[in-house]
């Protein structure tokens, strides 16, 4: 009697798949074949593995899950941004976003913003995800599955479609699901899978200081973005409750350690909120970052029902940016994508939950 635990094949790297295939009584080379079908070609069921016989496919089906995320809803913005609401095997829903950017160096840039948790425990004041609380962590297969299933859907329209960049900026705090996120990155980077370069992937964190240091040691090639939002602990406590555990002094020390170990610049994200995007706030950010290898990305906040926060004026955004530039801080204003479809994380999922109540 076979008592071996049935595993999600999307969770497994080539070595693990090879071992699992051997345990199923299959030739070891099947592991590489299965990995390529699942991770590179983003197949949705075992019948699509055309170079594997029916008998071996049945063994794979008996010993491994191949269960794609199910698309529940899709919204398409006027700028081409697509927002997907997917349902997991246990019925939970998650969001991810596909953003297309201008052609550069003769190649299209297709960026997927992925979620790492169902809900979020951090509870940032301007984020829709945290309004419903934290449910659970996503598995490596569920994290990278967002990329695979978007790839599969888009290849119905363009057979040559390929995701080029990943940002871990969707639902959840990536560094609170650390092991699963790093495993997903490993799988996405594999040249026989999606083959996405480490430097084309960026993790965004609310400021989990110990994990920032650990990331510098475990994977120094992946980009890091820190949700800063304020240079004052009192304000940041209100915007990002994580600050009460890891206040600015501890966070910035971890960031300095990160740049010392990796020699890589950190992107500091600042959500600009009407009434708070002041010159005084900009000057405080400039002073905080003056000795840090940093780039500031300004994000005019998306209005979210239930937060009471409004967007700043274009003049407020411009003055904030100019102030930082005058202090020698590199700064950019995020190119907005999908504003007409509520593309910020958590909004589509929250909309569905409100409809079902």
From Swiss-Prot:
One Pfam match: Radical_SAM
SUPFAM superfamilies: Radical SAM enzymes
Cofactor, free-text remark: Binds 1 [4Fe-4S] cluster. The cluster is coordinated with 3 cysteines and an exchangeable S-adenosyl-L-methionine.
Domain of life assignment: Bacteria
GO terms of molecular function: 4 iron, 4 sulfur cluster binding; metal ion binding; rRNA (adenine(2503)-C2-)-methyltransferase activity; rRNA binding; tRNA (adenine(37)-C2)-methyltransferase activity; tRNA binding
Entry keyword Cytoplasm: yes
Binding site for S-adenosyl-L-methionine: 172-173, 204, 227-229, 302
Residues in Radical SAM core domain copies: 106-340
Binding site for [4Fe-4S] cluster: 120, 124, 127
Intrachain disulfide bonds: 113-345
GO BP term, example: tRNA methylation
Cofactor(s) the record lists: [4Fe-4S] cluster
GO CC annotation terms, alphabetical: cytoplasm
Reactions catalysed according to its record: adenosine(2503) in 23S rRNA + 2 reduced [2Fe-2S]-[ferredoxin] + 2 S-adenosyl-L-methionine = 2-methyladenosine(2503) in 23S rRNA + 5'-deoxyadenosine + L-methionine + 2 oxidized [2Fe-2S]-[ferredoxin] + S-adenosyl-L-homocysteine; adenosine(37) in tRNA + 2 reduced [2Fe-2S]-[ferredoxin] + 2 S-adenosyl-L-methionine = 2-methyladenosine(37) in tRNA + 5'-deoxyadenosine + L-methionine + 2 oxidized [2Fe-2S]-[ferredoxin] + S-adenosyl-L-homocysteine
Subcellular location: Cytoplasm
InterPro entries: Aldolase_TIM, Methyltransferase_A, RlmN_N, RNA_MTrfase_RlmN, rRNA_lsu_MTrfase_RlmN/Cfr, rSAM
Family classification: Belongs to the radical SAM superfamily. RlmN family.
Function: Specifically methylates position 2 of adenine 2503 in 23S rRNA and position 2 of adenine 37 in tRNAs.
Protein name: Probable dual-specificity RNA methyltransferase RlmN
Species assigned in the record: Desulfitobacterium hafniense (strain Y51)
Gene symbol of the encoding locus: rlmN
């Amino acid at each position: 009697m076979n008592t071996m635990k049935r595993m999600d094949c999307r969770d497994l790297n080539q070595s693990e798949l090879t071992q699992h295939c051997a345990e199923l009584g299959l030739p070891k080379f099947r592991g590489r074949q299965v990995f390529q079908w699942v991770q590179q070609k983003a197949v949705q069921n075992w019948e699509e593995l055309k170079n594997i016989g029916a008998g071996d496919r049945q063994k794979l089906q008996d010993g491994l899950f191949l269960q794609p995320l199910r698309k529940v809803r899709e919204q398409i913005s006027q700028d081409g941004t697509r927002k997907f609401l997917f349902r997991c095997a246990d019925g939970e829903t998650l969001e991810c976003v596909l953003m297309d950017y201008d052609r550069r160096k003769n190649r299209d840039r297709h960026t997927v913003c992925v979620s790492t948790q169902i809900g979020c425990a951090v509870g940032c004041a301007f984020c829709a995800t945290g309004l419903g609380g934290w449910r659970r962590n996503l598995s490596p297969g569920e994290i990278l599955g967002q990329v695979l299933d978007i790839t599969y859907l888009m290849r119905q329209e363009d057979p040559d479609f390929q995701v080029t960049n990943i940002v871990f900026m969707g639902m959840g705090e990536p560094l609170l699901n650390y092991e699963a996120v790093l495993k997903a990155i490993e799988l996405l980077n594999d040249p026989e899978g999606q083959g996405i370069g480490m430097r084309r992937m960026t993790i965004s964190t609310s400021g989990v200081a110990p994990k920032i240091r650990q990331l510098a040691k475990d994977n120094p090639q992946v980009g890091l973005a820190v949700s800063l939002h304020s240079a004052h602990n009192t304000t940041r406590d209100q915007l990002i409750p994580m600050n009460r555990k890891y206040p600015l002094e501890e966070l910035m020390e971890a960031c300095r350690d990160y740049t010392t170990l990796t020699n890589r610049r950190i992107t500091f994200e600042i959500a600009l909120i009407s009434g708070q995007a002041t010159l005084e706030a900009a000057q405080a950010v400039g002073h905080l970052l003056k000795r840090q290898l940093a780039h500031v990305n300004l994000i005019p906040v998306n209005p979210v029902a239930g937060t009471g926060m409004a967007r700043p004026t274009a003049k407020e955004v411009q003055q904030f940016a100019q102030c930082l530039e005058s202090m020698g801080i590199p700064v950019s204003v995020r190119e907005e994508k999908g504003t007409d479809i509520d593309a910020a994380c958590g909004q589509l999922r929250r909309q569905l939950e409100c409809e079902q109540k």
